[in-house]
Amino acid sequence: MTLQHTPLNAIHRSLGARMVDFGGWDMPVNYGSQIEEHHAVRQDAGVFDVSHMCVVDLTGARVRDFLRGLLANNVDKLQTPGKALYSCMLNPKGGVIDDLIVYFFREDWFRLVVNAGTAPTDLEWIVAQNAAAGTDVTITPRRSDNNAGAEPLGILAVQGPNARAKTYAALPGSQAVGDALKPFNAGFVTVENVGEIMVARTGYTGEDGFELVVPAAQIAGVWERLLQAGVRPAGLGARDTLRLEAGMNLYGQDMDEHVSPLDAGLAWTVDLQSERDFTGKAALQAGGQREQFVGLILRDKGGVLRAHQKVITAAGDGEITSGTFSPSLSLSIALARLPKEVPVGTDVQVEIRDRKLTATVVKLPFVRNGKALVS
């Protein structure tokens, strides 16, 4: 299979990036030291090319009606232009088709940002649900590989305690817009020789920063400006250790179409209180929460927590969904699905290479805004 390329592919290669197949996309895993990239984001500022993710514009008079039924979270929370909401999109059995961010700009214009590997099936599902609902929404994907004739867009995630200041230095005129943004809000700024950029105060690292949605034809210039302002390129390897420390799910690993958001630590993104119906609601109400989603810290030496390892508890077995060595904590950490009866603070056993090693159950996240929340 031929891998898809983001508009920055040649630049990544010129920087010496190690490239990997990520969901059918040729993506940089690191540019040298993954741990140094991780620390740069926790302590200063790093930039990730996330143009493999897909922006989808939804337009029409009944977009809000359509999204009320499509998403598990309630888009009626979005009343101020630029406000964003994290949500899952569910199948009728309550499984997660994808997790995404929805932005509200006008009553006739909402914008989704969906995951890279799921984008084709997401679009098929959204088109089918629109047809079934008769809402007559126009669905326009904006990714470079599938943009329906619309101007293709790329995404740069600038993350870290100094990310905002360095973005302002790189993009003259952006500070007035950026300073006005609260977390999970977005605005637009016009930058000379670039055009209009969407600036969103969102991210996937547990640090402050922006996600910049940039015309694909101009994204190389924006990337170069960020590097000149002292932002360090960072790859998918650091992105994974950062999001894991932040207790953030990775689609396809921590949840998928067979997992309920209630069992993936995402109950806070599901609105079961309002009378609004949505796809998957009845299944969630009937099934309820079966398991809990927690953090683990390995206490014994001699192993690293990894996905699919069995977790043995007095209340029954569970499983690690994601695991790594945490550069910020110098500990092995994991996300895991365990029986609901296991309290935080409990020591459990993890099967690692025919050995049983002790780990402690902790509340997520492990790290937020550069600070360790566990020990």
From Swiss-Prot:
GO cellular component, one term: glycine cleavage complex
Species of origin: Ralstonia pickettii (strain 12J)
KW Metal-binding (keyword) present: no
Family: Belongs to the GcvT family.
Pfam families hit by this protein: GCV_T, GCV_T_C
This protein's UniProt keywords: Aminotransferase, Transferase
Enzyme class: transferase
Gene: gcvT
Protein name as it appears in the record: Aminomethyltransferase
EC number: 2.1.2.10
GO molecular function, one term: transaminase activity
Subunit structure: The glycine cleavage system is composed of four proteins: P, T, L and H.
Keyword Cell cycle: no
Task performed by this protein: The glycine cleavage system catalyzes the degradation of glycine.
Source domain of life: Bacteria
Gene Ontology BP, a term: glycine decarboxylation via glycine cleavage system
Reaction(s) catalysed (UniProt annotation): N(6)-[(R)-S(8)-aminomethyldihydrolipoyl]-L-lysyl-[protein] + (6S)-5,6,7,8-tetrahydrofolate = N(6)-[(R)-dihydrolipoyl]-L-lysyl-[protein] + (6R)-5,10-methylene-5,6,7,8-tetrahydrofolate + NH4(+)
